């Protein structure tokens, strides 16, 4: 489903842990990394598409995450000309995306790259919050910067409310 301007409706997903790190996924068989994302099917809401893509791409279900925020507006990026499929009609020149910020509430063990015939990702890792903005492919960089800027205060408040681990190796005075 391509809109009149040539953009495909899509959802993007930022998954964070309690430490404020974000899940960074490696595209199958490539050296490029990105956040999970995928198209919105006809008749599907952005939230429904997000949960479907979440399960299809990283094996997480609704019970594994909590929605913390979503972008106020649709964000767009254009594909480089070399990636546009000119032989398809209508021609898709880019993506318009609604982004969701999710907190992982289950454990890391629940994350698994599905073994379908066409998996999207073949690996993942936790990275610092701003790392993806510098590392994503250049044509997505502006959207990533805007998404991370919009979600930053939510993630930072999450970190502030997370209890810090006790320093169990602290020096103790002997009473004598």
From Swiss-Prot:
Coiled coil: none annotated. Residues 6-149 form the Nudix hydrolase domain. A motif (Nudix box) lies at residues 38-59. This is RNA pyrophosphohydrolase. Its cofactor is a divalent metal cation. Belongs to the Nudix hydrolase family. RppH subfamily. The gene is rppH. Keywords: Hydrolase. CDD domains: NUDIX_Ap4A_hydrolase_plant_like. Accelerates the degradation of transcripts by removing pyrophosphate from the 5'-end of triphosphorylated RNA, leading to a more labile monophosphorylated state that can stimulate subsequent ribonuclease cleavage. GO terms for biological process: mRNA catabolic process. GO terms for molecular function: mRNA 5'-diphosphatase activity. It comes from Shigella boydii serotype 4 (strain Sb227).
């Amino acid at each position: 489903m391509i809109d009149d301007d040539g953009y495909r409706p899509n959802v993007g997903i930022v998954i964070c842990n309690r430490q404020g790190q974000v899940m960074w996924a490696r595209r199958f068989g490539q050296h490029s990394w990105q956040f999970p994302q995928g198209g919105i099917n006809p008749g599907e809401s952005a939230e429904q598409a997000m949960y479907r893509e979440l399960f299809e791409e990283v094996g997480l279900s609704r019970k594994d995450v909590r929605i913390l925020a979503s972008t106020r507006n649709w964000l767009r990026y254009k594909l480089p000309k070399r990636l546009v499929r000119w032989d398809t009609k209508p021609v898709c020149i880019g993506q318009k995306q609604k982004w969701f910020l999710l907190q992982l509430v289950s454990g890391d063990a629940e994350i698994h790259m599905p073994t379908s015939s066409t998996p999207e990702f073949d690996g993942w890792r936790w990275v610092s919050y701003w790392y993806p903005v510098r590392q994503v492919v250049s044509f997505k960089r502006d959207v990533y910067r805007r998404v991370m800027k919009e979600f930053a205060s939510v993630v930072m408040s999450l970190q502030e409310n997370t209890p810090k681990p006790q320093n169990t190796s602290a020096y103790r005075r002997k009473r004598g």
